[in-house]
């Protein structure tokens, strides 16, 4: 088995799959949920396994490890929030990933009873409509009940590191 990039390895191991999929740049999200509108009941985690599913109805999906407390918390509350982080929120991401303790940087806003991170580019308050087991993860499909967004630069994750975006070409949205 080889660790060299660019060589074909016939064995698909979790490590090699993680390295391969790490080459797909993604935004960084914090998934949150709470039993009530009290900051002491908030549970959150950093996640990049998030995607849109449908525009009509408005559905998104987050993939959570079955070993994570968040999987149980989402099942218990039936709701979750997605905060898509801004470029200056790396410390917040690290806080929720357990890599750093930065409680002074964590401020919540509440939308539809769901905690979301102040300063994020996007807030999505979701109600779980389906949960599907998928290997060692659960795919939680959520209906977006309320959303908010702002302009700015996103925090990006690529090959295990935080990055920023560089504009290539035109500075206009593609039909949005």
From Swiss-Prot:
Transmembrane segments: none
Subunit structure, as described in the record: Homodimer. 4-nitrophenol 2-monooxygenase complex consists of an oxygenase component NphA1 and a flavin reductase component NphA2.
The protein, known as: NADH-dependent flavin reductase
One function term, GO molecular function aspect: riboflavin reductase (NADPH) activity
Induction description: By 4-NP in the presence of NphR.
Disulfide bonds: none
Role of this protein: Catalyzes the reduction of FAD with the concomitant oxidation of NADH. NAD is the physiological electron donor. Subsequently, the reduced flavins diffuse to the oxygenase component NphA2.
Organism: Rhodococcus sp
Classification of source organism: Bacteria, Bacillati, Actinomycetota, Actinomycetes, Mycobacteriales
GO biological process: 4-nitrophenol catabolic process; pyrimidine nucleobase catabolic process
Family to which the UniProt record says this protein belongs: Belongs to the non-flavoprotein flavin reductase family.
EC number: 1.5.1.36
pH profile: Optimum pH is 7.5.
Catalytically driven reaction(s): a reduced flavin + NAD(+) = an oxidized flavin + NADH + 2 H(+)
Presence of the UniProt keyword Hydrolase in the record: no
Keywords, comma-separated and alphabetical: FAD, Flavoprotein, NAD, Oxidoreductase
UniProt xrefs under SMART domains: Flavin_Reduct (SM00903)
């Amino acid at each position: 088995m080889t660790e060299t990039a660019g060589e074909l390895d016939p064995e698909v191991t979790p490590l090699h799959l993680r390295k391969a999929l790490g080459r797909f740049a993604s935004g960084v999200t914090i998934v949150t949920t709470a039993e009530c509108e009290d900051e002491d009941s908030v549970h959150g985690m950093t996640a990049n396994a998030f995607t849109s599913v449908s525009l009509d109805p408005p559905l998104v999906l987050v993939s959570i490890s079955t070993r994570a407390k968040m999987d149980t918390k989402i099942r218990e509350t039936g709701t979750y929030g997605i905060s898509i982080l801004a470029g200056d929120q790396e410390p917040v991401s690290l806080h929720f990933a357990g890599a750093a303790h930065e409680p002074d940087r964590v401020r919540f806003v509440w939308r539809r009873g769901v905690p979301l991170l102040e300063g994020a580019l996007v807030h999505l308050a979701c109600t779980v409509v389906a949960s599907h087991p998928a290997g060692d993860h659960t795919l939680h499909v959520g209906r977006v009940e309320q959303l908010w967004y702002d302009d700015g630069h996103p925090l990006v994750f690529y090959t295990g590191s935080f990055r920023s975006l560089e504009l290539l070409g035109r500075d206009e949205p593609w039909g949005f």
